[in-house]
Amino acid sequence: MADFDMVLKCWGLVEADYATYGSLVLTRLFTEHPETLKLFPKFAGIAHGDLAGDAGVSAHGATVLNKLGDLLKARGGHAALLKPLSSSHATKHKIPIINFKLIAEVIGKVMEEKAGLDAAGQTALRNVMAVIIADMEADYKELGFTE
């Protein structure tokens, strides 16, 4: 619980502007891990230099962060929230678990730079994301999705 609380201390800034933070997160994900862009077919035709200003990228990033905010606020009691996300990402979108680890790293970097998440907060975020991703991986296995 302490890890969730530590991350939530900085979450208000993110929550106040999901679109901007979402754009920063996805643009950085696509820059640092270009292979992840292929997992988002709707962004395939967008030039790399135009990703940051694209409304669709921003909107999807906002959705990602909004869902993450819900998971954080559940403070570990996230099974009912996570199950449908796991299901859609395993069965419909076919997103390998490693990609959640990559975006978690990027979220941490963006929160450090833009929302004041300090070293202890970074550790807390890594701990929280490890729990969420492990639970998601268990859901994936239950659904028979292996990468």
Curated annotation (Swiss-Prot):
Entry GO terms, CC: extracellular exosome; sarcoplasm
UniProt keyword Transport, yes or no: yes
SUPFAM superfamilies noted in UniProt: Globin-like
Residues that coordinate or bind heme b: 89
Heme found in the keyword field: yes
Compartments where located: Cytoplasm, Sarcoplasm
Coiled-coil ranges per UniProt: none
Protein EC: 1.7.-.-, 1.11.1.-
Residues reported to bind O2: 60
Family: Belongs to the globin family.
Protein name (record): Myoglobin
Species whose genome carries this gene: Pseudochaenichthys georgianus (South Georgia icefish)
Upper taxonomic lineage: Eukaryota, Metazoa, Chordata, Craniata, Vertebrata
